[in-house]
Amino acid sequence: MLESISPTSMTTADLLRGLVSIPSPSGAEAPAVEWLCRQMAALGYQAEPDGAGNAVGTRGEGPREIMLLGHIDTVPGEVPVQVVDGVLYGRGAVDAKGPLATFVVAGARAKLPPGVRLTVVGAVEEEVMSSRGARHLIATREAPDAVVIGEPSGWDGVVLGYRGSVALEYRVTVPMSHSAGPEATAAELAADFWYRLRTWCAEWSVGIDHAFHRVEPKLNALNSSSDGLYGEAVARIGLRLPPALSPEEAIAVATSLASEGGGTATVN
């Protein structure tokens, strides 16, 4: 385990390199959370993990709250931690331990007005659909007066909003048939569903130039299998949704399109 960094000499780069050096894939964030809480405490925060395992640090007292909300988990995969030509490489350096480290150091240096408290959160399980850390915050805390979300947008960019997302699982099972016969295989039915869904997304988005306002599908996985009697295909699909399209409407469309080929589409 890495040792704490001296608060008198801590920079954002120091904190970021230390944080990136601790693997924290979704569901296994505890070592990084504990280390970050120690660093925040050294910088003057009251810091500890909350009930979901989020790293939470607070400065100041008062009825008004500013929350700087980042996430501490990363997608899987190891990227060697190194600095090359002044650029830090490592899993999560950009998404999103960089913004989180910036929040921690900037928050420690900020001069807070009377009656204002500052809370920095490194949420867990943001990179998976559970969103455990964020859901815990919603369920257990009152809404802050202001929230800044730490996600990569370029050092000089401010993002004003994010599209919604829906993760779908398509599944279809059919009796096995001879390969020379006319019956569609499960894999073919899954491919047909993907084509229908992608076509619907494109038609919905006709005339819309900006990606933020379009429906954008992504086929993340497509697998087929057979036990000799039945063939099965499973597809995992993500939909990015604009403000004008509700998740309920998108799910209803996907369910209808899936049923056309005898399959099902459920929220994953």
Per-region residue spans from a language model:
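Flexible, glycine/proline-enriched loop segments at strand-loop-helix junctions
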Residues: 90-93, 123-127, 175-184
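Acidic/histidine-rich catalytic neighborhood of metal-dependent amide-processing enzymes
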Residues: 101-167
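N-terminal helical capping/dimerization or prosegment-like subdomains
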Residues: 1-67, 75, 232-238, 249-256
